[in-house]
Amino acid sequence: MLRLDSSDDKQHLVIRSAGGRGKAAEYSFGIEEEYFLADRRSLDVAIQTPNELFESANWSTGGQAMREMLQSQLEVATNVHVDVNDAREELRFLRREVANVAAQYGFVIMACGTHPTAVWRMSQPSPKPRYEEMIEDLRSIGHRNMMCGMHVHVQLPDPEKRMAVMRAMLPHLPLFIALSASSPFWNSHKTGLKGYRLAAYSELPRTGLPELFESRHDYDEYVGALQRSGVIPDESHIWWAMRPSMKHPTLELRAPDTCTFVDDAVAIASLYRCLTRHLYRRPHLSKTVTVVERAIAVENKWRAQRYGTDCIFASKDGPITISELLSRLIDDIVEDADALNCAAEVEHCRTIVERGSSAEFQLRAYRENGNDIAAVSRWIAASTISGRALRSDAPRLRRHSARASFGNDNGIPEFAVSRAVSWRKA
């Protein structure tokens, strides 16, 4: 069991074992995934969803499933983990549990950045005061927020070094966007982008890449100004691609699309975790990120959205392929991957580049089925539950493939009752 506690110097929050016998391993992490709820027969996105579904899902997962801003969305959050294999197994468990509950109400879950055929104008806010207030403020832009992302929290106790890591991490954010791209369709149209989600998400205020804050004080001053001006109630309304958590001693990656494959989600989370460790131990690297590097990162964010795993990034030295960029990064963090026992997961990022992210599979399903967008939805629904790529290329799909993939395995893995802390809505 894990719990939040104070550090030995009483200056920071840390994760400790429930027995109090010392800190858990540094750089513990958690993963949040958002899913679409869709009609089990038509795979059209759900418009209205009953509270009982979410109550059942919350109970079934031990409190790890909840509503999101729109009724068509459901979010799960893992517990805090120090072992990457535990995190993988919990994600699989959470998908199985919420899928089984959703099926009882006539729905399936779909893990992707955008639903291929969803019509945002029909979206309805979830019946919670927080979300109703957000829709009242955001209006049409809030209704257009029909998209799903993956968030990764990594524990970094020192708030000053946490801000240094956020700044140093900024040039790397486009890589996470490219690796996770799973949103090539919007409103039944092929967008031409591999990751359309962030293009739509950028309509919201306080999104995109973080600013170049020099210190935690500067960040707090910015947040305080918005709060005193009545712009935001708290810093959870800052929706950058990465942000410090409001409630926990973590730095939260928010850039990725929800991954269709569990192994891809765990690989991207592991890459981020290793890089945070690397940068946390070298806070001076934040000073190398200037306005020029940020401007290049903004361009590369667009390129990652447009091209996904086919991306060629811009750099001061000229173009660099995603394969070369990833290889350099893996070389830099090899010590960190060994220390965190996730070298295999980091290496899986190379597999994502070689065979493509979910966006490539979706586009293949579309082409191989005569440009039938319904085939894309069937592929996503089936692959969400299997959680893995069944072949190196997207299979030809039949109408029954999603339905045939739903199992009845309700086994609860040991970790589901052996963790006590999770990072949600922070």
UniProtKB/Swiss-Prot annotation:
It catalyses: L-cysteine + L-glutamate + ATP = gamma-L-glutamyl-L-cysteine + ADP + phosphate + H(+). GO terms for biological process: modified amino acid biosynthetic process. The keyword Kinase does not apply. It comes from the Bacteria. It is an enzyme of class 6 (ligase). Keywords: ATP-binding, Ligase, Nucleotide-binding. GO terms for molecular function: ATP binding; glutamate-cysteine ligase activity; ligase activity, forming carbon-nitrogen bonds. InterPro entries: GCL_type2/YbdK_subfam, GCS2, Gln_synth/guanido_kin_cat_dom, YbdK. The keyword Cytoplasm does not apply. Its EC number is 6.3.2.2. Belongs to the glutamate--cysteine ligase type 2 family. YbdK subfamily. PANTHER family: GLUTAMATE--CYSTEINE LIGASE 2-RELATED. HAMAP family: Glu_cys_ligase_2. ATP-dependent carboxylate-amine ligase which exhibits weak glutamate--cysteine ligase activity. This is Putative glutamate--cysteine ligase 2. It comes from Bradyrhizobium diazoefficiens (strain JCM 10833 / BCRC 13528 / IAM 13628 / NBRC 14792 / USDA 110). The lineage of its organism: Bacteria, Pseudomonadati, Pseudomonadota, Alphaproteobacteria, Hyphomicrobiales.
